């Protein structure tokens, strides 16, 4: 029974050995490629070698320069912030002190602005009283020698007139100090010879009356300006705290003019019209000369 089973297996092994032997493989290969011929080998040229070397160099260069194959991360645009210490950080006390300092500065600036506004709004007041002006005038008159015939306007040229000066004296001082330009007809209201009266509460009335007197062509001078001087005096009475000295001069002039007719035995109502007109011509800054005349009459 076993012999009949081994015989077919031995015949199969022999067939496999015969097909896998080297001689069988060579013969089978010869039979398979008998109709074909081997392809001839092509000779390489220098152009192909140059192309191959160029491609190799380009690949190496791209590998070394491309960021794709780089191991390091690219640098960021911004730099890292520096480390802060505790000394650099502001404390609560420092912040409170800074706020207090700023508040004090704002308060000081506000007070300075208010003081400047008050100073600008306060009108200019005469710096000297009538008594001081009269005393100065008498001292100057005594200082001048008797034989000196030089006019007073020339000896006091360039000096600011007193607050009690008459319109004629103001005009002379204005002409001497260049406040009035006769060629152009302009009046410099900022001239110190006017005593700052053009910038007070009644500055407009003073400008109107003084300019009318300067440009007046009537005889006696200023006869056509009586109404304007009356308006100016009415304005002075509204501000007695500013023009108190000028109002006192006007009252003294009125008392002197009223006492003169009584001393002569004539009634006060018969006072000449010219005296009344001269009284109306007295501006805000006059009249020291009237006070001197009153003393001489007494």
UniProtKB/Swiss-Prot annotation:
A Pfam family per the record: CHCH
Biased composition (Low complexity): 110-121, 256-266
Coiled coil: none
Domain CHCH: 199-243
Transcription listed as a keyword: no
Cofactors, names only: Cu(2+); Zn(2+)
Region (Disordered): 101-159, 248-298
PROSITE patterns linked to this entry: CHCH
Name this protein carries in UniProt: Mitochondrial intermembrane space import and assembly protein 40
Source lineage: Eukaryota, Fungi, Dikarya, Ascomycota, Pezizomycotina
